[in-house]
């Protein structure tokens, strides 16, 4: 994303306040770029937006600080994930890490799903 161009545009048009609401630009750091350019901005900075952008990060953070959350496992190796699912209790909720526009959650009733 070309955040610097957005900052230039906002300065040229003398925009008083930018409200950043979409996940991708928030996680990408648009708020940081706009604020660094001296533009008043409403929205979380990149280091806070990661809470929305990475469920794995969020869950790990909750676990670290004893914040109640549903049980979870993180996998980077598909074979390990499959091995886990072979012995898992169903139904089970699966979510790939990262942004999916609210559509990245699967509720599987059995291993085949």
Locate each region found by the language model:
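A short, GP-enriched loop/loop-strand-helix hinge that lies immediately N-terminal to
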Residues: 16-54, 66-76
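Sparse, context-dependent recognition of short Cys/His-centered cofactor- or disulfide-binding micro-motifs
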Residues: 3, 19, 47, 90-91
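Glycine-rich, highly charged phosphate/nucleotide-binding loops
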Residues: 1-9
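N-terminal glycine-rich anion-binding loops that anchor highly charged ligand groups
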Residues: 1, 30-34, 92-94
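Short, basic phosphate-binding NTP loop
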Residues: 4, 27-28, 84
